[in-house]
Amino acid sequence: MSQQRGYRKSRRGYVTSNSMDKTIVVKIEDRVKHALYGKVIRKTSKVKAHDQGSIAGVGDLVLISETRPISATKRWRLVQILEKAK
């Protein structure tokens, strides 16, 4: 009897730091509309993601996916690098 995994979030963002071992910091930008005034506001959040091969560099556009807790602050993992930094 195999259990199916639940829905896992995936996000796109830019790598802001890769100085930690097997860890990258990804800046995720989200656009939300203000409830009263309707203006579109950019909200950003920074998350730590697991990078097994330490292949992502600063400025890379990456796809990350939610996963089980890897450490005290890591709950995301690197899926693929969408665009390398220039």
Swiss-Prot record:
Origin: domain of life? Bacteria
Biological process (GO) annotations held by this record are: translation
- Molecular function GO labels: rRNA binding; structural constituent of ribosome
Q: Does the keyword Transferase apply?
A: no
Mention any one GO cellular component term assigned to this protein in its UniProt record.
cytosolic small ribosomal subunit
Query: TM segments?
Result: none
Entries under Pfam families matching the protein:
Ribosomal_S17
Q: Which SUPFAM superfamilies match?
A: Nucleic acid-binding proteins
Q: What does this protein do?
A: One of the primary rRNA binding proteins, it binds specifically to the 5'-end of 16S ribosomal RNA.
Family indicated by similarity: Belongs to the universal ribosomal protein uS17 family.
Please report the name of this protein according to its UniProt entry.
Small ribosomal subunit protein uS17
